[in-house]
């Protein structure tokens, strides 16, 4: 018998099949109401009609994902493009950030989700407090079935088949991994404030970078218990306005992060991450050559008369 990489350590690009394999790290969708909008397109931005919006609402989507250091420049292009348009950011609008995860293994992807979950409530309070509990932006605490599904998919090794439409309208959209090779973060309120969006992207990428280095998701649960929520937050959140907003929530910070860690526990301890079972491959050739002697002997014993050509 031969073995191959355990299921949990397989790269996502071997579990999912995407039409596009972009090199960029970040995709952004900005929903705006108001207008009128320019007749021509901004460089690397495509306008889409969004029927969930009102008053001439439109969604601008980055055409090609950009590297982290180009996020600010891309947003400035859109800002300049819309400078003469009336921009209205109502409760219906939001900013969605897609983080490319095609470079991750399944283990790293689970690490990323777990680490985000610990901070999720506090982060949503900073970037989109009015979206907390929104049915199109459900947090893990609002839909804890997502964690149970994730756990079962890891144990049964069926996770790619479980990422269905039920997960789309979440603060952290897991379904986007199956469809686009990203994790989509939907919590940010509608805005086109470049420093604010840049800080949000920086935060999401810092969590991804940490997830790539972690041994498994249980590390985060154990480390938070050892360091305490405040020091844990200081360690993993980059020093920016998003982190400042999280750390300012002293009255709820500990309870919120411990609740996030409790949600993560079922996933963090669902398998033995140190010794995941390998996938066994039989030595036999998948399609062995026919035994022609046996075939001819079998045919010789049959009455083939009357069989049409």
Where are these regions (language model features)?
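Terminal catalytic/cofactor-binding subdomain
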Residues: 1-86
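Aromatic/basic-lined ligand-recognition segments
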Residues: 25-27, 110-191
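Helical (often loop-to-helix) elements that flank the catalytic cores of nucleotide-handling enzymes
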Residues: 70-78, 102-127, 193-208, 246-252
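Flexible helix-coil linker/hinge segments at domain or subdomain boundaries
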Residues: 88, 121-135, 209-241
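Histidine-centered divalent-metal-coordination microenvironment in nucleic-acid enzymes
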Residues: 88-104, 182-186
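Beta-strand-rich recognition/accessory modules
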Residues: 168, 179-216
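Acidic, carboxylate-rich catalytic segments that either coordinate divalent cations
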Residues: 236-273
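A cross-taxon signal for low-complexity, glycine/charged-rich
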Residues: 286-287, 294-306
């Amino acid at each position: 018998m031969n073995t191959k990489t355990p299921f949990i350590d397989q790269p996502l690009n071997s579990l999912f099949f995407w039409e596009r394999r972009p090199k960029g790290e970040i995709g952004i969708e900005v929903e705006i109401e108001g207008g009128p909008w320019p007749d021509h397109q901004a460089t690397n931005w495509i306008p889409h009609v969004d029927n969930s919006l009102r008053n001439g609402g439109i969604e601008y989507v980055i055409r090609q994902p950009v590297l982290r250091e180009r996020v600010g420049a891309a947003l400035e292009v859109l800002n300049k493009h819309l400078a003469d348009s009336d921009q209205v950011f109502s409760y219906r609008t939001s900013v969605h950030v897609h983080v490319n995860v095609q470079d991750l293994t399944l283990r790293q992807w689970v690490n990323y989700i777990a680490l985000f979950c610990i901070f999720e409530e506090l982060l949503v309070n900073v970037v989109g407090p009015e979206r907390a509990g929104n049915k199109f932006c459900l947090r893990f605490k609002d839909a804890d079935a997502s964690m149970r599904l994730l756990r079962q998919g890891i144990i049964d090794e069926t996770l790619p088949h479980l990422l269905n439409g039920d997960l789309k309208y979440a603060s952290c959209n897991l379904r986007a991994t199956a469809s686009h090779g990203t994790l989509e973060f939907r919590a940010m309120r509608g805005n086109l404030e470049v420093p604010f969006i840049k800080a949000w992207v920086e935060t999401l990428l810092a969590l991804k970078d940490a997830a790539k280095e972690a041994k498994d998701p249980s590390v985060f649960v154990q480390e938070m218990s050892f360091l305490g929520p405040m020091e844990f937050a200081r360690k993993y959140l980059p020093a920016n306005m998003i982190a400042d907003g999280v750390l300012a929530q002293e009255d709820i910070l500990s309870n919120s992060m411990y609740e996030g860690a409790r949600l993560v526990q079922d996933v963090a301890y669902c398998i033995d991450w140190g010794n995941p079972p390998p996938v066994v491959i039989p030595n036999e050739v998948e399609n062995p050559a026919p035994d022609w002697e046996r075939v001819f002997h079998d045919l010789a014993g049959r009455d083939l008369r009357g069989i049409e050509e």
